Amino acid sequence: MVQSIDINKKLESILDKEEIKNNILMKNYTSFKVGGPADIFVTPNSYEKVKGVINICKENNIPYFILGNGSNVLVRDGGIRGVVVSFNKLNKVYAEGNKVIAESGTLLSMVANTALKSDLTGLEFAHGIPGSVGGAVTMNAGAYNGEISQVIESATVIDNNGKIIKLSKEELDLSYRNSIILKNGYVVLNATFALQKGDHDAIKGRMDDLMRRRKEKQPLEYPSAGSTFKRPEGYFAAKLIEDSGLKGTHVGDAEVSIKHSGFLINKGKASAKDILDLIEVVKKTVKEKFNVELNTEVRIVGEESEN
């Protein structure tokens, strides 16, 4: 465990006391509803504070983890050592002409709704994706034939030298669930989306239709991290899992959803270990049946529990 008292003192030089908490259970901050405690959990409310926290961590060899909405993260039962930097206070979003500018902690659904209010089309696919802007840009999030790379103009990030820089769409090097941000460990502060003027009712109709399809086909009533696995080249992960006879397979309260086999869900009291063990069952079975390697889309972080 990180010596929290020493680091707390350093963090208090740039953060307000209420922006620093200790031993916070991560299950309360992830959509899977699992995860042990973070040593230190901070909620900076400005870019300079984020930059300062990261600099303190680097100077003191303290590991840090950037947390958005926690919707694509699986935190192990032992929790996270070091500092978790939550972006939930950095959530401003506004439209300016044909563009929408959003801070990293803004929910994608809020970004889509902001576009709708200004009759801007292009972000309908993002309505209903549970993530925030930072994670969405980092992973080039997408759904229903839309993805971030189609609409992003630029992103402001903290680079590895601790500098705040602006990256163009080309510099972001977005590909399937990947980007220069993910490769280099940059931290997203905000993003600008370039959209088109459209018909308000048509935009709302598409958003409503996609939400209806999500509710019909996805187990939104249970905690999950959305699609657990990346799409293998030439295949669909959900179909491979279903054709392997794995629907309804469970380890403890972790289950392969009967509604959508691409989702692993928490039926109530699953531990992170239950979910991780189920991931291994799925990967092993699909490999044996189809000789296809499944890779997780969800980010797995933290320490194993000592119990």
Curated annotation (Swiss-Prot):
Known EC number: 1.3.1.98
Protein function: Cell wall formation.
Protein known as: UDP-N-acetylenolpyruvoylglucosamine reductase
Record flagged with keyword Flavoprotein: yes
Catalytic function, reaction form: UDP-N-acetyl-alpha-D-muramate + NADP(+) = UDP-N-acetyl-3-O-(1-carboxyvinyl)-alpha-D-glucosamine + NADPH + H(+)
Cofactor: FAD
NCBIfam families hit by this protein: murB (TIGR00179), PRK13905.1 (NF010480)
GO biological process per UniProt: cell division; cell wall organization; peptidoglycan biosynthetic process; regulation of cell shape
Gene: murB
This protein's UniProt keywords: Cell cycle, Cell division, Cell shape, Cell wall biogenesis/degradation, Cytoplasm, FAD, Flavoprotein, NADP, Oxidoreductase, Peptidoglycan synthesis
Subcellular location: Cytoplasm
Active site (catalytic residues): 177, 227 (proton donor), 297
GO cellular component: cytosol
Pathway: Cell wall biogenesis; peptidoglycan biosynthesis
Principal EC category: oxidoreductase
InterPro entries: FAD-bd_PCMH, FAD-bd_PCMH-like_sf, FAD-bd_PCMH_sub1, FAD-bd_PCMH_sub2, MurB, MurB_C, MurB_C_sf, Oxid_FAD_bind_N
Gene Ontology terms, MF aspect: FAD binding; UDP-N-acetylmuramate dehydrogenase activity
Family designation: Belongs to the MurB family.
Keyword Translocase: no
